[in-house]
Amino acid sequence: MTTVRAATGTVAREAANPAAGWAGQATARSGSSIDWLTGFGLVGVVALLFAVSGGMLWLVGYNYDGLTGNPATKIHPSTYLLVLVFAWRACTFGNPVGYMVAIADRRPASALLAVMSIVLLVVVIARQRPGMAGMIDTFVAPALLVMMLAEGDEKTFARLRTVIHVVMTANALLALFEFATKTLIFPYRLDGEAFMTDLRSTALQGHPLSNATVTSIYVLALLSGSRSLSMPLRLCLIGLQCAALVAFGGRSAMVLTIVLGGCYMLLQGLRGLSTGRVNLLGAALGLILAALVPVAIAVAASYGFFDALLERFVSDSGSANARVEMFELFNHLEWRDVIVGPDIDLIESLRRISGLEQGIENPVIRMVLYQGAFFTLLLFVGFALFMHEVARRCHAGIWLLMLGWLILLNTSESLASKTTLMTKFVVIALVLYRPVVGRPKAQAGHRPQAQPRVSSS
């Protein structure tokens, strides 16, 4: 009788609320691992994301970075593949609507950001504002990927770790090759025009500043995450990536990596001394590096390795002045324009007059100027909740990566324009900071207790 009543109550609730039934069915199935095609599809998405730049796509006739051409080419191929993998997974789940409810229930902030971005995309199109493709690649893609990675098993995450380390190592080696030979293999192009006077390395990530941002984030992840790698291997990768940072010429990324990385290593060293637990091998490696690194830097400097980077610190091509001039644009706008967004032609004219043709180097200021403060506030709330959700799925060392990411965001247009940076960040965070999954208690110690029988009387 009790069993029948419980089943009857469940059916009644599902009949009254179909969404609850879908969510319940999804919860029951969510424990199972994803199928092999979805797993390898996610690996392919990450490989395309990190290894294929706009300059590489131009060689096959895909004008991703340009302003002209087919609108379909303004979305990165990794985003298209991600949507296909998502559709496949929804179909194989058995109930596409139930699948979407399930992953939204597991990652609500990601679902909110995706829905909010799609709604704002419709608003952008209706108001004929720029940034249509930016809404998809910048916000929808990372939210969708986070929701799909919630189902990932250990094998999938192990493959993703391998892809990240291999591609980032290849990216650094290619950057150093370009730096040494003064030849760009896949130069950054805008509508087919390559900026050949800018000899900063582009490697696999495209624009030098995008390269510098991703590399800096990866170095911080090697310091406080990547626990699956041995310490000597991590130190070698950190050295290689720091050398690549010089080739990319990112001043903010270089300074941030040195300051945050140095502070983190100092804190870890002091913590080890305070607890009295000092790893002898780690201490020996630290002493050796402390002796060799200054020598290596001096030798590299004598061969002119840092000349290009130092030149960018001396002459920033008006970058510092642009960060001051961008605030002057608000003096020409009314409050209504600030709230809902001014006329695009007016903003473009003010930019040319103020010498800001190269861009507005702050995402919040740029988004307010082009989309309005109300639009920007909505995205900011969604972004904050999304970052909090990502951080909760990582182990404690994520604070270093999150701090570096939030600082670097404000040194360029970043999220206010079309970019794949946030997708790359969430992949690095979720994959390299994945908590160690322990064995269930039932397997570790004792057998689960048998359920008591329910009397039928």
Q: Which residues does each predicted region cover?
A:
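Membrane-interfacial helix-loop-helix modules of multi-pass inner-membrane proteins that assemble, modify
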Residues: 58-66, 158, 169-208
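Alpha-helical transmembrane segments of multi-pass inner-membrane proteins
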Residues: 161-185, 206-249, 254-267
